[in-house]
Amino acid sequence: MKVTLFVTCLVDMFETNVGKATVEVLERLGCEIEFPEAQVCCGQPAYNSGHVEAAKEAMKHMIETFEDAEYIVTPSGSCATMFHEYPHVFKDDPKWAKRAQKVADKTYEFTQFIVDVLNVTDVGASLPGIATIHKSCHMTRMLGVTEAPGILLSNVKGLTVRELPNVQNCCGFGGTFSVKMTPISEQMVDEKVDSAMETGADYLIGADCGCLLNIGGRIERLGKEIKVMHIAEVLNSRS
């Protein structure tokens, strides 16, 4: 099975280890990974900031880059969601809307692909300790992926998963929201950190690097002792 990887901007620039873990997990599951070097940003930051035409140019480039893929997989629920929004963005342009739909139909978030397409619930990972899961807004509310991360983590040897209080609450990242509305964002992430600490977990695990960079940065500034990990890193663990 050929999988074309959309690595995302944040993974490419800040969390390359997440990209490596994503590839290694998928390869162990029998996937052949392709990486188009022409890939750029999915256009979400520009689109959400109101720069629609600039966003469309990036989106068109991404459609051209990925439309011939068999499966498109990304370690980000937020970026996967943006791919699924492409048909809506181009709804008044039938030519591009059709091409956008073709891309959207074969785009999956990393854990969604493992559980729903590969039909795998245990990847053979092991990580001793206690974890709690942060569920990102776009991934759960828009993409509809709510169960796959928990299913996979429940089968990680040695790992106990505890429910995160107020798990439905946003972490305060929201892309440019955290920059434009910093005081509100800080209050939101403080509440998220407090909830994570309440669980007594060793690890806070999520599927979006934006959320994890935001939460992890706040944890570090506050001097809290809980390790933030992307789920790809956890599933690639052999502790």
From Swiss-Prot:
Give an example GO molecular function. oxidoreductase activity
- What InterPro entries does the database record attribute to this sequence? Cys_rich_dom (IPR004017), LutA (IPR022822)
Question: Could you say which residues form the signal peptide?
Answer: none
Matching entries from Pfam families are given as: CCG (PF02754)
What domain of life is recorded for the organism? Answer: Bacteria
> What would be one Gene Ontology cellular-component term for the protein?
cytosol
Q: Name one GO biological process term.
A: lactate metabolic process
**Function in brief:** Is involved in L-lactate degradation and allows cells to grow with lactate as the sole carbon source.
PANTHER family, per this entry? LACTATE UTILIZATION PROTEIN A, UNCHARACTERIZED PROTEIN YKGE
Q: Name the protein family.
A: Belongs to the LutA/YkgE family.
Specify the protein name.
Lactate utilization protein A 1
